[in-house]
């Protein structure tokens, strides 16, 4: 038995001898940064049942021959609640049996039955992706779920996070170019003519069937060899992160289809598995076991407000530089004409270099959000900000002993969709040129309102006797004590952000300040997301009353502040939500 330290990059589970086995993919920090797959057989799935009659519920559940039953005291929207923790043999048993449990007469409700097994493991074990893990284990010669020579370890002791983040990650970017004489590329007939790759591991090249006179071009025999050479590079380098731009919806689906037509092998996974494309909402998501695939296109759509999100436009906005651009509908012409082909090669290389530069600038924030939310980077990079906030709260709920509310039913969702909270107060800007302007704004207005007014579904009450904060306009009442679940969590976020900003002030190290700035920016984004998701129809902690109360207090504060300013001789020329501009007239 040995001690291991690894940076956790990816996680899933497989079934071995009818037993669910969690697989942890990472780089072994105690052994030369080698890839390693750790198998943990100790964890089992579970859900909670809220009984109407505890003894009767236990009796009915025992008849179902479940793996294990345990009575626990938890909180349900702040109320002490006795629940039964129901353990299962396998994750696939949960959807098979949960409806039978829900339908028992002695069961009022079931909870946390829709949390994926690998996410449950991360939450319960307090393990954070992109951080170092420590565990004891025994290296095995082979494992049924691994067909490569990547080291495999059977976990024999507790797996725990060290709290140390991942540094010096190996990042590889890629991009394909297609000969498209008929317009939109068609993988059934239009060949891939080059694949560019660039990384921080000293690799920068374009693979193609031509161009041997250029020193950055690696020439192969045909398209099949082109695809297999790309696969060979990914398998050999085993980057921690593989980045593309629109690679979920274009590059990888195209590569996969061309490989199938040509009979090329694309077993890129650390375990020997093929790349896998799945649906995530309205888009595709392509996964490689072990290596984290990040598509920067949806990431940039979340973080930037642009007229269009082409690679060229995003690159220019981030760096103030123009990258090489060619007309997409004429790329085939640049390939077919000898005098133009070199331009296409340089365009291909510029694409992957630009993608890599964008990744180096954007990924630190995503890595920090991964550590905060506690879910894999693969998922975080594809989550809307509201989903990130929800999974952050799910993780915190486990720590607080709170039951996680269920997702809304279709009927609940439909009834919620029509409701919209009134937004912040806006005074349209006065036309003209204004001088001697002063600006006033509230710092973290909505998060501060949530904390100061204790706005949370578990503090909302109709009780006229309780000591409450009463929302303007609506009259919603929120108990002053105890502190609600969501205000408590947001309070933690803001306190940690203040601590980090103080640490930044005291640091003279530019690199440390840069890291700390990314951390506080991630906390800021998370805190500012919280108020908005109260009114999101699919949010587990949905409460239109909370959403309306927050913006009502916001409007009240800004209007009162403007009125006070005007009493002192200021004239407001523009106001929006959490601040205003004014001129002084005396």
From Swiss-Prot:
| UniProt xrefs under Gene3D superfamilies | DNA Polymerase, chain B, domain 1 (3.30.342.10), Helix hairpin bin (1.10.287.690), Palm domain of DNA polymerase (3.90.1600.10), Ribonuclease H-like superfamily/Ribonuclease H (3.30.420.10)
The yes or no answer to whether the keyword Transferase is present is: yes
**EC number(s) recorded for this UniProt protein:** 2.7.7.7
> Which domain of life does the UniProt lineage start with?
Archaea
Q: Which GO terms describe its biological process?
A: DNA-templated DNA replication
Q: Does the keyword Nucleotidyltransferase apply?
A: yes
Keywords of the record, alphabetical order, are: DNA replication, DNA-binding, DNA-directed DNA polymerase, Exonuclease, Hydrolase, Nuclease, Nucleotidyltransferase, Transferase
Its UniProt entry gives the catalysed reaction(s) as: DNA(n) + a 2'-deoxyribonucleoside 5'-triphosphate = DNA(n+1) + diphosphate
Q: How does activity depend on temperature?
A: Optimum temperature for DNA polymerase is 60 degrees Celsius, functional between 60 and 80 degrees Celsius. Exonuclease activity is higher at 70 than 50 degrees Celsius.
**One MF term in GO for this entry?**
DNA binding
Reported regulation of activity: DNA polymerase is inhibited by replication protein A (RPA), while 3'-5' exonuclease activity is not. Polymerase inhibition can be overcome by replication factor C (RFC) and PCNA.
- Stated role: In addition to polymerase activity, this DNA polymerase exhibits 3'-5' exonuclease activity.
| Quaternary data | Formed of a complex between PolB1 and PolB2; the exonuclease activity is associated with subunit 1. Probably binds replication protein A (RPA).
The entry's other comment says: In some Methanobacteriaceae the PolB protein is split over 2 genes.
* Family statement drawn from the similarity comment of this UniProt entry: Belongs to the DNA polymerase type-B family.
Q: What is this protein called?
A: DNA polymerase PolB subunit 1
Q: Which organism is it from?
A: Methanothermobacter thermautotrophicus (strain ATCC 29096 / DSM 1053 / JCM 10044 / NBRC 100330 / Delta H)
Organism classification? Archaea, Methanobacteriati, Methanobacteriota, Methanomada group, Methanobacteria
């Amino acid at each position: 038995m040995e001690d291991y330290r690894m940076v956790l990059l990816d996680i899933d589970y497989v079934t071995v001898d009818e037993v669910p086995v969690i697989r942890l993919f990472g780089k072994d920090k105690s052994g030369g940064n080698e890839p390693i797959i750790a198998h943990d057989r100790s964890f089992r799935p579970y859900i909670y049942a809220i009984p109407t009659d505890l003894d009767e519920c236990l009796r009915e559940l025992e008849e179902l021959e479940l793996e294990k039953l345990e009575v626990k005291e938890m909180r349900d929207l702040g109320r002490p609640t006795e629940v039964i923790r129901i353990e299962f043999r396998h994750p696939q048993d949960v959807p098979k049996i949960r409806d039978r449990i829900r339908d028992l007469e002695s069961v009022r409700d079931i909870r946390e039955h829709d949390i994926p097994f690998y996410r449950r493991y991360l939450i319960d074990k307090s393990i954070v992706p992109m951080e170092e893990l420590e565990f004891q284990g025994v290296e095995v010669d082979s494992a049924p779920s691994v067909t490569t020579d990547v080291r495999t370890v059977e976990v024999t002791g507790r797996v725990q996070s060290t709290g140390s983040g991942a540094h010096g990650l190996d990042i590889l970017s890629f991009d394909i170019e297609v000969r498209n004489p008929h317009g939109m590329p068609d993988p059934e007939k239009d060949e891939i003519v080059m694949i560019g790759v660039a990384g921080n591991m000293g690799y920068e090249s374009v693979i193609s069937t031509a161009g041997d006179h250029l020193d950055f071009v690696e020439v192969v025999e045909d398209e099949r060899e082109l695809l297999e050479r790309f696969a060979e590079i990914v398998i050999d380098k085993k980057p921690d992160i593989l980045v593309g731009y629109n690679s979920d919806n274009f590059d990888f689906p195209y590569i996969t289809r061309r490989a199938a037509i040509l009979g090329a092998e694309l077993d890129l996974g650390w375990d020997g598995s093929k790349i896998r494309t799945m649906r995530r909402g309205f888009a595709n998501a392509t996964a490689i076991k072990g290596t984290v695939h990040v598509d920067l296109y949806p990431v940039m759509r979340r973080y930037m407000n642009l007229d269009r999100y082409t690679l060229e436009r995003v690159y220019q906005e981030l760096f103030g530089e123009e990258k090489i651009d060619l007309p997409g509908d004429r790329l085939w012409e640049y390939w077919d004409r000898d005098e133009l082909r070199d331009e296409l090669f340089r365009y291909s290389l510029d694409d992957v270099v630009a993608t890599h530069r964008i990744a180096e600038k954007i990924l630190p924030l995503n890595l920090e959000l991964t550590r905060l939310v506690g879910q894999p980077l693969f998922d975080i990079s594809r989550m809307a900000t509201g989903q990130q906030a929800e999974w952050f709260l799910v993780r915190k709920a486990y720590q607080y002993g709170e039951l996680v509310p269920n997702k809304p039913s279709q009927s609940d969702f439909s009834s919620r969709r029509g409701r919209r909270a009134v937004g912040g107060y806006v005074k349209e800007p006065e036309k003209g040129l204004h001088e001697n302007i002063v600006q006033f704004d509230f710092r973290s207005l909505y998060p501060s309102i949530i904390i100061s007014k204790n706005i949370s579904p578990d503090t909302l009450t109709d009780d006229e006797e309780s000591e409450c904060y009463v929302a303007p306009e609506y009259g919603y009442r929120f108990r002053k004590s105890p502190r609600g679940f969501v205000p408590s969590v947001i309070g933690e976020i803001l306190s940690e952000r203040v601590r980090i900003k103080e640490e930044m002030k005291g640091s003279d190290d530019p690199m440390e300040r840069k890291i700390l700035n990314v951390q506080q920016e991630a906390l800021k984004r998370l805190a500012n997301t919280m108020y908005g998701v109260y009114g999101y129809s699919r949010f587990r902690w949905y409460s239109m009353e909370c959403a309306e109360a927050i913006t009502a207090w916001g409007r009240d504060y800004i209007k009162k502040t403007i009125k006070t300013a005007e009493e002192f001789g200021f004239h407001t020329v523009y106001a929006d939500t959490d601040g205003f501009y004014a001129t002084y007239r005396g």
